[in-house]
Amino acid sequence: MANTRTQRRENELPYIPFGPFQIRLPFIHYKIESVEFIQGLILGVTALAAVPYLEQYLGLPYELAWSCVIIETFLYLLHSLLGDPVVPGWITPTLPLTIVFLEGFPMGEERIQAMIALQMLVGLVFIFMGVTRLADKFVHAVPNSVKGGILLAAPVTVMAGQLGENGNMHKYPLAIVAGVGLLILISFSDKYQEKRKTNKFLDLVARYGNLFPYLIAMVVGLLVGELDAPGLEIGTFIKIPQFKDIIDQVSIFGVGIPPASMFIKALPLALVCYVIAFGDFVTTETLVSEARQARDDEYIDFNSSRSNLVSGLRNLILSIIAPFPPLSGPLWVGMTVSVSMRYKEGKKAMKSLLGGMASFRLATFLSVLIIPVVSFFRPIFGVGSSITLMFQAFVCARIGMDYCKSDRDKMIAGVMAAVLATQGTAWASAWALA
């Protein structure tokens, strides 16, 4: 790996240099941002929307699946700890492909081994791209038309899933529309941004980003009967993960190392997952660049090689301990946008971008441990996941179109997006090169 910069730039958040990483600790290198922390305590439980995938496709009981998600959520903290200025998430658009892959194996240890093989390969691809620094070259060398096509494929994939036969839009249409509509309004409406300057309530709603859209979706869902009434489990306060059961029933130590044939079968999908996740690096680069332009009091260092390494570590650790079908991605687009928009409001709103993102994910980890919070918000897991996905679709569509400057870019990106969303990377690459 090339020599890593160790000199801190002017106005850059303090850190401890550690190879390619920049170690930062809460309360020492950055302050906890209260707004993001409160959002994380409430919105963080949406991480448990992954529980149904672990139950349905890996055959895990609810309590064990919850324990696996706690470990996955803890690993979110690696990004802020190691100097990656993002709110990390899943590689969500690959989930339908992962499910199809898993269904090719019988339920039980064999299917869990298949998930281990896939996630381990995904982690190794991320790490390879980070160690060789090919990620930096890849991000800057890929033509704008291809970047646009990759990003525009996300809304096609997301909306196809949400509007499909088993999509959540058929289960919770009014709740989702209410939540997504409000989130888009407070994020992109020029009129709303003008009115919030003179209206304290509108300003409060906007400052808390995703919080009010989720709460509105919950209220609407309850009123129209799309959601069950929330319960409040009183008694034990903190969920202790079932570490022994995880090691015995889910980890590579319990189910065994996957055979070579599984790795061979998983390799094409692992490469597809990376190509799709690549769009998150493009999105992050754009969002960080916009944040830099909005403020000159802090230098924000986004390095795609570092981001690859951290994402790779998360996937590699999970593949060994608690394989995770949504996979570990470099970005939760919706929340990263929400935090960066508040950051742009100035130092009084948020001192540090990384501090805001770290505060959210620290609270996320705490929220999935607090049993009363999890039990209360459990009915909205599916709706919250859909709001996040659909907002991501809007953001990716905006940024993808921004990359298309010429008519040729627009033609290539449009066709590539459609082919990538429906047929995969091989066909999409052929169209891009044609």
For the regions a language model picked out, list residue spans one by one.
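Helix-loop-helix hairpins and the membrane-proximal interhelical loops
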Residues: 1-62, 198-302
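Helix-coil boundary and interhelical linker segments in multi-pass alpha-helical membrane proteins
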Residues: 52-66, 101-114, 164-167, 263
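Loop-to-helix transition at the N-terminal end of transmembrane alpha-helices
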Residues: 58-81
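Membrane-embedded alpha-helical modules
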Residues: 111-227, 355-434
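Membrane-interfacial loop-to-helix junctions in multi-pass transporters
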Residues: 62-70, 146-148, 260-264, 299-309, ...
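Generic transmembrane alpha-helix motif of multi-pass integral membrane proteins
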Residues: 52-56, 76, 80, 414-422
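Hydrophobic alpha-helical segments of integral membrane proteins
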Residues: 134-142, 159, 163-166, 236-260, ...
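Helix-loop-helix junctions within the multi-pass membrane cores of secondary transporters/permeases
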Residues: 17-32, 39-51, 79-151, 297-393
